[in-house]
Amino acid sequence: NNILNEKTLDIFVQNQVQIAQNELENQKNQALSLALMFSKNQDIINNLEKNNHIELKKELLKLLNIIKTYTKNSIDIQIHTKYLEVFTRSWEDVDFGLKLDSFREGLVKVRNSNEPYVSTELGKRFNIKAIAPIYNHNNLFIGSIEVIVDFNPLINRLKGLGIDSMILLEKDYLNIATYHSDNPKLGDYLILQSSFSKNLLDILIKNPNFLKNDSFYYETDEKVFTQIPLGEFENSSVGVL
C-alpha cells in the first residue's frame, strides 16, 4: 500500500510540475508574441534609427495603453541599441546609454543569433524577458526590443488551478538584481512576489529543508512541495518556482 501510494504521489507531483511548466511557457510565449509584433512597428523602427528617444517613448506608452484595455498584466518595454545599450524604457528615464552585455545573456544571444529569444532572465529585476531583433528597411540590425512581464500572472493562474506557488531568487544575485534588495528573505532566497498564501510561507519557514533540492518533493499532512528551476546565469541556477 505504501509503495502504491508513493507511486501515485510521484505521478501526481509530476503532473502538477508539468502543469506549472506549461503555464510558464504560455506566459513566455505571450511575451514573445508581443515583442515580435512590436519589433515590426514602423514608428519604433524609425525613431530608433533617428536616435529619437522622446518620440519612441511616446510610442511605447501608446502601445501599452492599448494593451491595458485587453489585459491587467503589468508589462514594461525596453529598447536597446545595436551595441546593447539602453535606448529607452517605458517605466523610467534613467540609464540611457548603459551597456548591458556584461550581465544580460539574452541580449547577447539575440544579437549574435539574430533570432528572438524568451527566458526567465536576470537583470536589475528577475522576470520574464522576451527579446526580438529590430531591422531597418535595408534589413540591417539596428537594435532590439524587450517585453518584460513579472511573475504575478503566472502565480495567479496557478492559484486558479489549485497550485500555491512563489518565486524565489538566489540572494547571491542581488549585486545584479538590485531592484529586489528590499524584498523579504527566506533562507538563501528572496521572495519576489506577494500573491501567495501565508500558510505556504509559514510551512516553508518551519521546514527550511523544503528549500533544498535533495528530494523531488517534500510532503506534509496538507501539502506537497516541489520546485522548478528558473533561469540561469553563467550556468548556475538563478531562482526557483
Feature map (PLM): residue ranges:
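Juxtamembrane extracytoplasmic/periplasmic/luminal helical "stalk" adjacent to the first N-terminal
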Residues: 1-55, 65-75, 115-116, 160-164, ...
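Extracytoplasmic/periplasmic ligand-binding sensor regions of membrane-associated signaling proteins
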Residues: 68-148, 156-158, 214-219
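Membrane-proximal N-terminal soluble sensing/regulatory segments of transmembrane proteins
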Residues: 47-53, 137-147, 157-160, 165-171
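Short, hydrophobic beta-strand elements of compact beta-sandwich sensory domains
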Residues: 141-150, 224-241
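Short hydrophobic alpha-helical segments used for membrane anchoring or interfacial signaling
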Residues: 36-37, 76-83, 165-173
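Short, positively charged
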Residues: 9-11, 51-61, 108-114, 202-212
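Intrinsic low-complexity, intrinsically disordered coil/linker regions enriched in small/polar
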Residues: 153-222
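Stable alpha-helical elements in mature extracytoplasmic
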Residues: 56-59, 63, 103, 154-157
